[in-house]
Design a protein with these regions (language model features):
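Bacterial Sec-dependent N-terminal signal peptides
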Residues: 1-35
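Pepsin/retropepsin-fold aspartyl endopeptidases
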Residues: 28-457
C-alpha cells in the first residue's frame, strides 16, 4: 500500500529502533492510557487464548473490529501489521517513523494512529496509540497459520496483574488494587526490573557440567517462541559450545534471523532448575539494537515460560512461577530443517457418505421391508495450503532433496490440508529417527521424499 493512503502530516520524521522476533521494542516518549477493568465489582477478568507455535494469541476488539494479537512482554508499544487493511480499522494517522528491525536489513516505515479504543470483555483501554507498519510483505500470519494483526505488550501488562496458565490456555487479568497474593509454598517469587517498558530478570546458567555458574540478566519475552537466546560475548564466559548448528530463528522487520543452536547444562530460575535446555546464540550484528541495554545477556522465551503457571506483576515488580506438567518435558527443536508456511487456500473435493432409511413395497427373502441405502456425493471445500519456505543446508530434509517453494501435499500419508500449521511443525519436533514421508508438488509434478529426524545437539 502506498503511503499516500494514510493522511498524515509529513513535517516530522522520527527515527525509532525496533527489535522484533515475535517481540518488539520501541523507544518512544508518547503516552497512552493502559487497560482498566470496568465495573466496581470486577476484581478480575478471564479470557481463553490460542497457543500456536509457542505463542499466545488473544482476541482484542479494536474500534469494533475483532483482531488477533500476539501477547508479547517484550513489546513497549502496540504494533499493527498489514497496512493495506489498517485504514479500515484505525484512523487519525499522524507522523511517519523509521523502524529498525532485528536482522541486517534496512529500516521500514510506520505511522502512528491515535485515539483508538481497545476492549477485551470487561477490560477497556481508551485513547490508545497504535503503530502501523507500512510493509505488507511482513507477514506473521503465514508463519502462524491464522491471521495475526499485531502484537501487544506493555500497554496490557503495565497496570494489571496477569496469571497465565499455559496448561488450560487461560489468562486471568487482576485489578491490582483488589488482588491479594495467596501463600504458595510451591511457587517462586522473583524480582523483576522494568527498563524502557520491558521486564528483565536475574537468572543463572551453566554452559556445561564442568563450568561455573554464570549470573545473567535476561529479557522476559513471552513473544519469543524459543527457550533461550544468548548474546554471544555479552559476558566473557558466554560463548557458543563446540556442538552447535546454524538454525533459522525467525523473521524481523529487517530480514531473516539465524543463530547458532546448541544446548547448555542448566538454567536456574530461583529454586527451579531446568536441565539441558536448547539455546540460540546470536551474533553482535543481528542484535545490535537489542544490545543497547548493555547489562542484558539475552532473553527467555515461551520455551521456558510454558513450563510454569506465570504471574506477571509489573505494579509490584515481581514474577511468580509455579511449575506445571510441562516442566519435565524434553527441550526439542525442529529436527527436519524445514520451515513450512501457510500459502493461502485451495479448493478440495471431498467424498461425503450419507445413509437414507426407508420401507420398500416388496419384502426381502426374510420378509423385511426396511432398507438402508448408502448415498455418495462430493463436496467442495476451501482448505489450507502449505509450502516449504526454507530448507536448512545439510539438514535431513535438504539431504533428501526437499527444496524451497515445494508445495506440501501429504505428510506421512495424510493430506496436508487436514493439518493446522502448528500441527505440522510439531511433527518435526518429535522423537529422533522418526520417519517423515512427504508428497510434494514441484513444477506441476508430484514427488515423494522421505527422511528420518536427526538430533544434532
Amino acid at each position: 500500500m502506498r503511503n499516500s493512503t494514510f493522511k498524515f502530516p509529513m513535517k516530522k520524521i522520527v527515527q525509532i529502533y525496533l527489535i522484533l522476533f515475535f517481540g518488539v521494542c520501541i523507544n518512544l516518549n508518547s503516552q497512552s492510557k493502559g487497560f482498566r477493568l470496568i465495573g466496581a465489582q470486577n476484581s478480575y477478568q478471564d479470557i481463553s487464548f490460542q497457543f500456536i507455535n509457542n505463542l499466545i494469541v488473544i482476541p482484542i476488539q479494536v474500534n469494533d473490529k475483532k483482531l488477533n494479537f500476539i501477547l508479547d512482554s517484550g513489546v513497549s508499544k502496540t504494533i499493527v501489521f498489514n497496512s493495506s487493511r489498517a485504514d479500515t480499522i484505525l484512523s487519525n494517522f499522524q507522523n511517519k517513523y523509521k523502524l529498525k528491525g532485528l536482522g541486517e536489513g534496512l529500516p521500514v516505515n510506520a505511522v502512528i494512529s491515535k485515539n483508538n479504543l481497545f476492549k477485551i470483555n470487561n477490560l477497556i483501554a481508551v485513547n490508545k496509540n497504535v503503530y502501523v507498519v507500512l510493509k505488507d510483505d511482513f507477514d506473521l500470519s503465514s508463519k502462524m497459520g491464522i491471521t495475526i494483526h499485531g502484537v501487544i505488550g506493555y500497554d496490557i501488562f503495565s497496570d494489571l496483574i496477569l496469571r497465565i496458565n499455559y496448561k488450560s490456555k487461560k489468562i486471568r487479568f487482576y485489578n491490582p488494587s483488589q488482588y491479594k497474593q495467596k501463600i504458595c509454598s510451591k511457587c517462586e517469587v522473583l524480582p523483576i526490573t522494568i527498563f524502557q517498558k520491558k521486564p528483565y530478570i536475574d537468572l543463572s546458567l551453566k554452559l556445561n557440567n564442568n563450568s561455573k555458574i554464570i549470573p545473567i540478566k535476561m529479557l522476559i519475552d513471552s513473544g519469543g517462541s524459543d527457550a533461550i537466546w544468548l548474546f554471544e560475548y555479552s559476558n566473557e564466559k558466554i560463548v557458543t559450545p563446540e556442538n552447535f548448528f546454524t538454525d533459522f530463528l525467525g523473521v524481523g522487520l529487517s530480514g531473516t534471523v539465524y543463530g547458532k543452536r546448541s544446548r547448555i547444562s542448566s538454567l536456574g530460575l530461583g529454586k527451579f532448575l531446568l536441565k539441558k535446555p536448547t539455546v540460540s546464540f546470536l551474533d553482535t550484528l543481528s542484535t545490535k539494537e537489542a544490545r543497547r541495554f548493555n547489562k542484558r545477556n539475552g532473553s527467555i522465551g515461551t520455551g521456558i515460560l510454558k513450563r510454569f503457571t506465570v504471574w506477571f506483576d509489573y505494579p509490584n515488580n515481581r514474577l511468580m512461577l509455579k511449575k506445571n506438567n510441562f516442566f519435565n518435558e524434553e527441550f526439542n527443536y525442529n529436527m527436519s530443517g524445514l520451515e513450512v508456511v501457510y500459502d493461502g487456500k485451495i479448493l478440495v473435493e471431498e467424498l461425503s457418505r450419507n445413509y437414507s432409511r426407508g420401507r420398500g413395497e416388496t419384502p426381502d427373502p426374510n420378509g423385511n421391508r426396511n432398507y438402508i441405502r448408502l448415498i455418495k456425493s462430493y463436496e467442495y471445500k476451501f482448505k489450507p495450503n502449505f509450502k516449504i519456505n526454507d530448507v536448512l543446508k545439510g539438514s535431513p530434509a535438504d539431504i533428501a532433496g526437499v527444496m524451497k517453494d515445494d508445495i506440501l501435499i501429504k505428510i506421512n500419508g495424510n493430506p496436508a490440508y487436514n493439518f493446522q500449521l502448528h500441527e505440522i511443525i510439531s511433527i518435526f519436533h518429535k522423537k529422533e529417527n522418526n520417519l517423515i514421508r512427504l508428497t510434494l508438488m514441484r513444477n506441476n509434478k508430484k514427488i515423494k521424499i522421505q527422511f528420518n529426524l536427526k538430533k544434532i545437539i
